[in-house]
Each structure stands twice: as structure tokens, then as C-alpha cells.
From Swiss-Prot:
The lineage of its organism: Bacteria, Pseudomonadati, Acidobacteriota, Terriglobia, Terriglobales. This is Cell division protein FtsQ. It comes from Acidobacterium capsulatum (strain ATCC 51196 / DSM 11244 / BCRC 80197 / JCM 7670 / NBRC 15755 / NCIMB 13165 / 161). Belongs to the FtsQ/DivIB family. FtsQ subfamily. Pfam families: FtsQ_DivIB_C (PF03799), POTRA_1 (PF08478). Gene3D superfamilies: Cell division protein FtsQ/DivIB, membrane protein fhac.
Length: 388
């Protein structure tokens, strides 16, 4: 009996020592308590320690056992059905669905036709008179000029008026640059135009017209002349029969010429009475100077520099050559002056008629007499005769 008691006490003592070592390591990891007295007061007795302090179960690493795999529960993915209800999968369901579709399509078509019939035949959408057509943007053209395009549309439904065709007919009028036609419910049309702006007079034979920057010839009526006082140079050398693209190119050359002359002085263009654009490589302008006219050849470039050359020497040339009629400024370092041919003396009655060869020789001689060449280059340099 004594041996058993002793053996039990030794076992308990060894267990207590192991537990105390484990508690020492555990207490080192736990942060210190605020007060040691409170800790001793809260410490349980020896019997409670023996009852609660039991050895920890061995870990899987120490025991050599493998950890059981974590089994996840798979979620069931719901199977989505189609947009159609389940009864459409059967034969009679499909027939019913097709019938409903055809019924809806027929109903939509019926509504569209009914609305179209209402819009096409209702008298409230008919153009009753010319007062139902509004015009905007016309200053040179009269309202009657624009309404002449819509003569067949009076009494017609506005939805039957071809707007694109009417706009094209308006733009065929020379003064109309751009036209827009739109419907205004219930029974009106609105016509808006942009008119062309003339930039010069155009002389075609004995008739004088206007022309814009794109080469479009504009008729000049007496009413238009009484309304405006245009102050443009007169252009020659543009035939309305040539293509519009060629006319537009020559008008761009004309505008470039005016811009170059106006860059030096605003009143230079007032001296120009006529501009000949027949040759696109030689702009010929007629200037008024000293009570008579001078024909100047400017070529097709360097207009401002060539005009300054003319303006700086014209007084000297007029003093040296009173019969000066033409000045060719196209060359780089020389100016060609041409004099007016003196009138031929009246032929005597008893004089024999000269032969054609004599007339030709006389004209050539006169031509050589009235031509003067003034060189501006240095004497050691040769003058260049290449025209620009």
C-alpha cells in the first residue's frame, strides 16, 4: 500500500515538473500582468491545477500523420432557360408563337399605312397658296424669282414635294450659290438661299455682266444697277462657254493680282480700268495715267514688285517718251516700252497704190521705231529675256 502511494506521488511529481516547464514557456509568450499580487490571488489551487493542466495532443508533424485534405462543396450552377416560355417548345406552342408574331407584324403594318394615308390625303397638309412658302436670304433676287421654281407645288401635299430636286433647281439660278428647302408642318415650306457676291464686271462683246470669285457669270439687270453702285474693274478674256473650272482659275489669278496691288496702297486699284485675262500667263492691265491709258504686262507672278518698278519710273518714262502706250514688266532686269504708232498721213489721189509687200515692210519698220528697251541690269551683266 505504501509502495503504491509512493509510486503515485513520484508520478504526480514528475507530471507537475513537466507542466511547470510548459507553463514557464507559455508565460514567457503572454504579456506580463499589471500586478503580481493580483495574479497570485487569481491563481487556482493545486487540485484545480492538476485537474485543468492536461498534456496537449500531439501535432500532426510530431506524430507523422498527414493532414486530411480540405473538401470544398461545389455550388450548383443554375441552368438558364431560353427567353421563350416552356410551352413554346411543343408543336402547338410554336404554332401559337408564330401566329402571334404575324399578328403583331400585321398590326404594325396597318398602323404605318393608316398614318401614311392620313398624312398624304389630309387637306391640312396641302400648300394652299404661295403665301405658304417662306423665302429667306434673297437680297439681289426677288421673291418671285424664287417662287417660280415652286409653281407646280401649289395645292400639293407637302410630303409629295421633292425637296432635293427643288433645291437643285434653285441652285441652277446663277445668283444662288446654295439653297435649302425644308417642310414646316402642317402646310408650309421654308426656302433659304445664299447668294453669290460679284467681284468684277465682265465685258462680253458689247454686253456688260457681273462675275463672282468662282467664275459664275451673273446677269446685271437695270433694277440691280439702280439698287447698287458697283465699283469694280472690267474684266475681259473670259468666255462663258469655257469650263467653269478654267474660269475659276482665272478669277483666282485676278483676285491675287488685286490683293498684291492693294498691299502697297488702297488706291492703286482705282487706277485700273480694265484687266485682260485671256492669257493665264500674262495679266494685262490698263492703267489711267496723265489723262491717257497705259497697257501694262504683269505676267503671272511678282505683281507687287513689278508695280513698284512701274510706279518709280513712270514719270521719267512719260517725259522721255510722250507717246508711251505699253509697258512690258514681265522680264527680270529689263522693261520693254512700246510707243503709239503715229497716224498715217492721208493718201493723195494721184498717188499709186503701194504693193502689199511695201505695206508689210512699212508696218515692220514702224514697229521697230516705236519699240524701246530699257535695261536695269549692270552693264557687265547680260539681260535675261525669260518672262515669268
Amino acid at each position: 500500500m505504501a509502495k503504491t502511494t509512493r509510486h503515485n506521488s513520484d508520478s504526480q511529481r514528475g507530471l507537475t515538473l513537466v507542466e511547470e516547464d510548459f507553463l514557464d514557456e507559455f508565460e514567457d509568450a503572454v504579456p506580463p500582468v499589471p500586478s503580481a499580487a493580483n495574479l497570485r490571488a487569481a491563481e487556482p489551487g493545486p487540485r484545480a491545477q492538476a485537474r485543468t493542466r492536461r498534456p496537449l495532443p500531439p501535432s500532426p508533424e510530431d506524430s507523422g500523420l498527414e493532414e486530411e485534405p480540405f473538401l470544398r462543396v461545389r455550388r450548383r450552377v443554375p441552368v438558364r432557360s431560353g427567353p421563350l416560355p416552356s410551352w413554346t417548345k411543343h408543336r402547338w406552342g410554336k404554332i401559337l408563337l408564330a401566329s402571334l408574331f404575324l399578328l403583331a407584324l400585321g398590326l404594325i403594318l396597318f398602323v404605318v399605312l393608316a398614318v401614311r394615308h392620313f398624312l398624304d390625303h389630309d387637306p391640312r397638309f396641302e400648300i394652299s397658296s404661295a403665301a405658304s412658302i417662306q423665302t429667306m436670304g434673297n437680297s439681289e433676287l426677288s421673291r418671285a424669282d424664287l417662287l417660280s421654281v415652286f409653281g407646280s407645288d401649289i395645292g400639293r401635299n407637302i410630303f409629295f414635294v421633292p425637296l432635293g430636286e427643288r433645291a437643285a433647281q434653285l441652285e441652277s439660278i446663277p445668283w444662288v450659290k446654295h439653297a435649302t428647302v425644308m417642310r414646316i408642318l402642317p402646310d408650309q415650306l421654308r426656302v433659304s438661299i445664299v447668294e453669290r457676291t460679284p467681284v468684277a464686271f465682265l465685258r462680253i462683246g458689247s454686253r456688260i455682266s457681273l462675275i463672282d470669285a468662282e467664275g459664275v457669270v451673273l446677269d446685271m439687270t437695270p433694277e440691280l444697277m439702280a439698287k447698287h453702285h458697283f465699283d469694280f474693274p472690267v474684266i475681259t478674256g473670259i468666255d462663258p462657254a469655257i469650263p467653269l473650272a478654267m474660269r475659276a482659275q482665272r478669277m483666282q489669278l485676278y483676285l491675287h493680282f488685286l490683293s498684291a496691288l492693294n498691299s502697297d496702297s488702297q488706291h492703286v486699284i482705282d487706277q485700273v480700268s480694265e484687266i485682260d485675262l485671256a492669257d493665264p500667263e500674262d495679266v494685262r492691265a490698263t492703267f489711267n495715267y496723265g489723262g491717257h491709258e497705259l497697257l501694262l504686262h504683269f505676267g503671272y507672278t511678282n505683281f507687287a514688285a513689278r508695280y513698284r518698278n512701274y510706279a518709280s519710273h513712270i514719270q521719267t518714262w512719260e517725259q522721255l517718251y510722250p507717246r508711251l502706250a505699253s509697258i512690258d514688266l514681265r522680264y527680270d532686269d529689263q522693261v520693254v516700252l512700246r510707243m503709239a504708232t503715229p497716224p498715217a498721213p492721208p493718201a493723195k489721189l494721184d498717188a499709186k497704190p503701194a504693193s502689199p509687200a511695201a505695206h508689210s515692210h512699212g508696218r515692220k519698220a514702224a514697229h521697230h521705231k516705236v519699240r524701246r528697251v530699257i535695261r536695269h541690269a549692270h552693264p557687265t551683266h547680260h539681260a535675261t529675256r525669260r518672262a515669268r
